[in-house]
Structures are given as structure tokens and as C-alpha cells.
Curated annotation (Swiss-Prot):
GO terms for molecular function: aspartic-type endopeptidase activity. This is Lipoprotein signal peptidase. The keyword ATP-binding does not apply. It catalyses: Release of signal peptides from bacterial membrane prolipoproteins. Hydrolyzes -Xaa-Yaa-Zaa-|-(S,diacylglyceryl)Cys-, in which Xaa is hydrophobic (preferably Leu), and Yaa (Ala or Ser) and Zaa (Gly or Ala) have small, neutral side chains. It comes from Azoarcus sp. (strain BH72). It is a multi-pass membrane protein. This protein specifically catalyzes the removal of signal peptides from prolipoproteins.
């Protein structure tokens, strides 16, 4: 067993809450998508409020349907990219496992990314169904996974901004 400093937990124990959060995000994302797939037809719109609708669409590209019009290679490209990014974020989560904000951010991104990877593998595209609009202007439809990824990136940025405020400022360099 590796030597642990006083008050330090084993890596798996320290990462467990964040891994559970990632799994919960992925599970909730997939549950909501299964409900939508079971109850809606492709392209069907269910108005909820004057600015929010449920609409079932399939996104073969990335954010904002980037590369969606291509022949299908992007399915495997975005799947591979998500797997690589999740691996990198797991390594960062391990590195920052005793913190709170960064591992939570990484967990949200990982859970969302895996949720969308599952879609690409099962459906060949990501299932989107949340649509916000104002009059004729609308935001592209998205899903819970996309929301978790966005929230995770926002938390990462916030953590970095907070960390920058706590660093002592370096004085001017003096020539030797």
C-alpha cells in the first residue's frame, strides 16, 4: 500500500464522489433521452413555455451541429476525441483529487461527454431535445449532457480565476 501523508486519503477513495457524480450525470442524461425517444417522434415540437419547447432532433456533428453535414466520419472522430478528453480529465481529476471545485467540473464534463458518446454509439448521432427561443430566433437544441459539459467548463474557468487571485504577484524582474 502506498505511503499516505497525514490526512490524505487513498486516490480511489478521494476520487469516488467525483466518479459517482460523472456516472449520475451520464445516467440522468441517458434516462431523459430514453424518455424523449419513447414519447416523441423525430422533429415533433411540444411547446412548454413561450420561450422553451421540447423537440426531438439528432445531431450528427458537434456543438451547434458543427460538421453535421459530412458523410459520417465525424461520428467516430467525435467519439474518439471525447474518449481522449475523458482520459485526460480523469488524470487531472486524480491530480486535483483533494480539491472540490476542479474535480466537480471534470466530473460534469466527463459525465456529459460519456452521455453523448453513448448516443453516438447507439444512435449514430446525439439526441437533442431542449430548445430555447425568442420569436424566430432560437438557440440550437441541446440535452442534459451538453448542459453538464457547459457547467463543467464554466466551473473550470471559475476555479482558474479564483486560483489566479490567490497567487502572490511576482515583482518586477531585475537584471542580473
Amino acid at each position: 500500500m502506498p505511503d499516505l501523508q497525514a490526512g490524505q486519503r487513498p486516490a480511489f477513495v478521494a476520487m469516488l464522489p467525483w466518479l459517482v457524480l460523472a456516472a449520475a450525470v451520464m445516467g440522468l442524461d441517458q434516462l431523459t433521452k430514453q424518455v424523449v425517444l419513447a414519447t416523441m417522434q423525430y422533429g415533433e415540437v411540444i411547446p412548454v413555455t413561450g420561450f422553451f419547447d421540447l423537440v426531438l432532433v439528432f445531431n450528427r456533428g458537434a456543438a451547434f451541429s458543427f460538421l453535421a453535414e459530412h458523410s459520417g466520419w465525424q461520428r467516430w472522430f467525435f467519439t474518439g476525441l471525447a474518449v481522449v478528453i475523458c482520459g485526460w480529465l480523469l488524470a487531472l481529476m486524480h491530480q486535483h483529487r483533494e480539491e472540490r471545485l476542479l474535480p466537480a467540473a471534470f466530473a460534469l464534463i466527463i459525465g456529459g461527454a460519456i452521455g453523448n458518446v453513448v448516443d453516438r454509439l447507439l444512435h449514430g448521432a446525439v439526441v437533442d431535445f431542449l430548445y430555447f427561443h425568442a420569436g424566430r430566433y432560437g438557440w440550437p437544441a441541446f440535452n442534459l449532457a451538453d448542459s453538464a459539459i457547459t457547467l463543467g467548463v464554466g466551473l473550470m474557468l471559475w476555479a482558474q480565476l479564483r486560483a489566479g487571485k490567490h497567487k502572490p504577484e511576482a515583482g518586477p524582474e531585475r537584471p542580473s
